[in-house]
């Protein structure tokens, strides 16, 4: 989230501490905060960290479950406002495997008139990175690491399995 926030405008501000005045930084007065959109359920694990960086950001949710036969996302929840009027968005999804969920979320956000869309991940597969790029629905993709490849059932290798299952203790 820090890296995805890199291009937000900042301004210097005066800060008074108990030991004396100093200069700090703040988001610029004209900076429009991105809408944070965790892809449920795994994206919930990234939301607290994103709100620690951008505490005044609004949040919307997109609930997607992967169809294990087609590997495509099925929507079960969408609380994103109907018209974002160009507001920037950060999609929070810890794993970018096939990119089906990220592409679907980004297309839904485009349909709601989102501004710049940044997909923020912890772990990605090269196939997912390429699929997201080819889809053209996201303006940027930020990931902490890119693993080797996808296996025959669309999981990242070596990866960590299902990120939501890991977070919520499901076997």
Please give the residue ranges for each predicted region:
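PRPP-associated nucleotide enzymes
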Residues: 1-171
């Amino acid at each position: 989230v820090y890296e995805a926030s890199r291009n937000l405008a900042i301004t210097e501000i005066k800060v008074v501490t108990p030991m004396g005045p100093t200069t700090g930084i703040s988001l610029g007065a004209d900076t429009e905060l991105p809408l944070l959109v965790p892809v449920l359920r795994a994206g919930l694990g990234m939301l607290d960290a994103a709100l620690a960086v951008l505490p005044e950001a609004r949040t919307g949710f997109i609930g997607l479950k992967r169809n294990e036969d087609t590997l495509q996302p099925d929507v079960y929840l969408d609380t994103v406002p109907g018209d974002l009027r160009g507001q920037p968005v950060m999609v929070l999804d810890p794993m970018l495997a096939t990119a089906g969920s990220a592409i679907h979320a980004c297309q839904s956000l485009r349909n709601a008139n989102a501004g710049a869309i940044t997909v923020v991940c912890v772990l990605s597969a090269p196939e997912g990175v390429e699929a997201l790029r080819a889809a053209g629905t996201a303006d940027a993709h930020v990931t902490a690491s890119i693993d080797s490849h996808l296996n025959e059932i669309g999981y990242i290798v070596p990866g960590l399995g299902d990120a939501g299952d890991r977070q919520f203790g499901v076997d």
